[in-house]
C-alpha cells in the first residue's frame, strides 16, 4: 500500500505541474497548448512566483551575447501581453553599477500586470489550476511517480499524471520521489533571496554624479 492510497483520487492527467512560478506556468501552458490535459498546482493565491510576489520588476538576460535576441513562444506572449497593458517598455539595456561594460538586456515590468498576463496565458491554454494548494508528497511505483498528494480547503486529495513536472521552489517533489538532490554549492551556500522594493523622491542627479567607488559601495548595500 502506498502512503496516500487512503485519500480520494480526484483526477488523472497527462501532465501535472507542481509550482506556478515562471518555470511552472510556462511548462503547464506549453503542455496544454500541445493537447495534454494539464493540471497546475500552486500553494499561493497567484501565479508567477517571485517574479510577481517579490516585486522583482525585471526579467533578465534577453541577448544573444551582443544584442537583444528576438523572443519566441511563451516569452513572446508574456512580452506582448505586458505591452498591451502598458506594463513594460520592452527590452531595454541596463548597466550594473552604472558601468558600460556590465550591460545586460532586461524586460522591466509592473508585477501586478505580469500576474494578470500569466493568468490569462494559462487560462487561454486550457490549464486546470488549483491555487492555495500545497503538495505534501508523492507515491511511486517502479521508479516513477504514481500519484501526487496535496492539501487545500477540500482536505487531502491526490491526482495521477503520466508526467509530473517539479517546478516547486524547493524541488521537494523530486526529492520526495527519491531523486538525488543538492542544496547550494559544495559548501551548502545558497543564493540569497531577492525581495525588491520601490523608492520615491530619489535625487537622480546626485546619483548620476556618484563616482564609481561610491556606486560600488551602494551596490554592495544591495541598493543598486
Question: Model-derived features: where do they sit?
Answer:
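Core beta-strand elements of the Rossmann-like FAD/NAD(P) dinucleotide-binding domain
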Residues: 11-13, 154-163
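N-terminal Rossmann-fold NAD(P) dinucleotide-binding loop
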Residues: 24
Amino acid at each position: 500500500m502506498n502512503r496516500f492510497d487512503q485519500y480520494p483520487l480526484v483526477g488523472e492527467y497527462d501532465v501535472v505541474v507542481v509550482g506556478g512560478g515562471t518555470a511552472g506556468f510556462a511548462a503547464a501552458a506549453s503542455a496544454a497548448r500541445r493537447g495534454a490535459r494539464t493540471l497546475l498546482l500552486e500553494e499561493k493565491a497567484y501565479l508567477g512566483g517571485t517574479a510577481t510576489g517579490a516585486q522583482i520588476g525585471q526579467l533578465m538576460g534577453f541577448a544573444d551575447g551582443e544584442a537583444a535576441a528576438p523572443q519566441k513562444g511563451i516569452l513572446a506572449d508574456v512580452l506582448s501581453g505586458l505591452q498591451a497593458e502598458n506594463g513594460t517598455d520592452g527590452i531595454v539595456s541596463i548597466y550594473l553599477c552604472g558601468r558600460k561594460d556590465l550591460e545586460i538586456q532586461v524586460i522591466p515590468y509592473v508585477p501586478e500586470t505580469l500576474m494578470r498576463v500569466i493568468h490569462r496565458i494559462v487560462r487561454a491554454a486550457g490549464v486546470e489550476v488549483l491555487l492555495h494548494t500545497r503538495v505534501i508528497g508523492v507515491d511511486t511505483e517502479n521508479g516513477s511517480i504514481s500519484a501526487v498528494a496535496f492539501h487545500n480547503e477540500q482536505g487531502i486529495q491526490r491526482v495521477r499524471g503520466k508526467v509530473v513536472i517539479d517546478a516547486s521552489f524547493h524541488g521537494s517533489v523530486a526529492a520526495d520521489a527519491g531523486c538525488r538532490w543538492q542544496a547550494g554549492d559544495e559548501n551548502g551556500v545558497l543564493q540569497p533571496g531577492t525581495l525588491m522594493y520601490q523608492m520615491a523622491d530619489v535625487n537622480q542627479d546626485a546619483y548620476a554624479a556618484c563616482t564609481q567607488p561610491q556606486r560600488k559601495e551602494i551596490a554592495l548595500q544591495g541598493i543598486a
